[in-house]
Every structure is written in structure tokens, then in C-alpha cells.
A protein has these predicted regions:
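Domain-level signal for Mg2+-assisted phosphodiester chemistry and nucleotide/NA-binding surfaces
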Residues: 1-150, 161-167, 211-212, 221-223
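Nuclease catalytic cores that cleave nucleic-acid phosphodiester bonds
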Residues: 120-247
Length: 247
């Protein structure tokens, strides 16, 4: 009997602060995916491995977000599952190593000084501020963010763009998921692969994995109907099932 692998793009999936996601919401997500797996593959698998990907490390330190996710996930007891007198083992893991490697990929959540320059959509800008840009918040913000060295124009204020604004970015997470999708799909004992993500950067890797192993049951759960409609046709060409997932 084979395995079903579930790859969940955690930060991409949930909106707002991850810290506000409840344990019950996590459980509902896992349960919905597992039910889909068993409906299609109950006779092909005996084990389900759920892997959660995200920017879990800032430097070499586990982030507060990662600790919160780990704590809540560890309290969810779904396995083993008994259905029609058959037992399905499994696990749910917050992962920081890719399949086939033992090293942890650190520094997957990075802070960068400043915010990229904003562009104004002229079609949606009202003409009322055209002659008074100096008091229009849209133009003030756009001008302040033009360069990272920009200083506040208020007399006596020395606030600098790059010192007051910063952004956080995930690094390597998409690449790690793509590597795992390709690697897992090549394993003989993996009967089904389920990817839960709205990130279109993963789609080429999903497609080539299915081409290399057409026998694997490949499934993609996306958050938005818009993503589903935009990519359903091309993914169905490769016999990849795509559906919207209610959270």
C-alpha cells in the first residue's frame, strides 16, 4: 500500500495574522483534505503525511508564528484513522527540511529595509488633487517611498524611509515545496500528492511532476475561485485535479 503526501503552503493559504488562526480552523483544513484523499484513494494508501511549509526561521531562531503553529498542530489528534475496518496511519509536521535532505534551511523569513516604490494608477486617481499634490496622502506617500534615503519633509523631523518602514519576505519556501513535489512524485510508494496553495509559482513544478509520473494521483487545492478558473484548463491538460478549498 502506498502513501498520500499533502503539501500545504501555509502562509499563502491563510489571510491575516497566522497567530489569529484557531486550532479548530487548522483541524477543519486537515480534515477536509484527508476526507478528499480517502474518498479517492482508500484502497491505494495506508499512510497520509501532511507537511506544513512556511518561513519558520528568522536567522537561526524559530519565529513566534512557527511556535504558535507547532503548539496548535501538536494538539490535533487525527491519526490513526479507522474507516470501514481499515487503519490509516499518518502525521502532521511543520517542516524546515526538504524531503531527502537532513539539513535545516534557516533564514526563511527575512526582513528588508524600506518598501518598494509605489506606482499610482492614474486611471483611478481623482483629478481633485492634481493641483494640490502636496497635501494629497497618495502623492505624499508615493514621493516618500521613491528612495530608501528619503527624509520626512516636516521641519525638524529626521525620519528616514528605510529606518521607519520594513517588509518581511519568505525565502526558499516556494523552491523547497517545488523540490518536494518533484521528488515525492518520483517515489514508487507515493500514490497520491495533494498540494494546498494559491501560489501560481508552484504550478510549473506540479505539471512537470505529473508528466514524469502520470500514474500518480495529482491534486491541487486553491483558496480562490479566480485562481481555479484561470488555470483549470491548462492543469486539466496534464490530468491534474484542481478545486477551491473552503476554509
Amino acid at each position: 500500500m502506498g502513501k498520500a503526501i499533502v503539501i500545504i503552503d501555509f502562509n499563502n493559504l491563510f489571510r491575516g495574522s497566522i497567530m489569529n488562526i484557531t486550532q479548530e480552523q487548522y483541524k477543519n483544513l486537515f480534515t477536509n483534505v484527508i476526507e478528499e484523499i480517502l474518498q479517492k484513494n482508500e484502497n491505494n494508501i495506508s499512510e497520509i503525511l501532511v507537511r506544513l511549509y512556511g518561513g519558520w526561521y528568522q536567522g537561526h531562531n524559530l519565529t513566534n508564528m512557527a511556535s504558535d503553529v507547532q503548539t496548535k498542530v501538536q494538539q490535533i489528534d487525527l491519526f490513526p484513522i479507522i474507516k470501514d475496518k481499515k487503519k490509516y496511519d499518518g502525521s502532521i509536521e511543520v517542516v524546515s527540511t526538504q524531503y531527502g535532505l537532513s539539513e535545516i534551511w534557516y533564514n526563511t523569513l527575512q526582513e528588508k529595509a524600506g518598501i518598494p516604490r509605489l506606482r499610482i494608477d492614474e486611471e483611478h486617481q481623482d483629478t481633485g488633487c492634481e493641483q494640490r499634490k502636496e497635501i494629497c496622502p497618495v502623492h505624499i506617500l508615493q514621493k516618500f517611498l521613491q528612495k530608501k534615503a528619503t527624509i520626512c519633509r516636516n521641519p525638524g523631523c529626521k525620519t528616514e524611509h528605510s529606518k521607519v518602514f520594513y517588509r518581511r519576505e519568505q525565502k526558499m519556501v516556494d523552491t523547497m515545496m517545488t523540490c518536494d513535489i518533484i521528488t515525492y512524485s518520483a517515489e514508487e510508494d507515493v500514490a497520491a500528492l495533494y498540494i494546498v496553495s494559491d501560489d501560481i509559482d508552484l504550478f510549473p513544478g506540479i505539471a512537470i511532476s505529473k508528466v514524469k509520473n502520470n500514474s500518480i494521483d495529482m491534486n491541487l487545492f486553491v483558496r480562490t475561485t479566480q485562481t481555479k478558473l484561470a488555470y483549470q484548463q491548462i492543469l486539466s491538460t496534464y490530468n491534474i485535479n484542481i478545486k477551491s478549498l473552503e476554509l
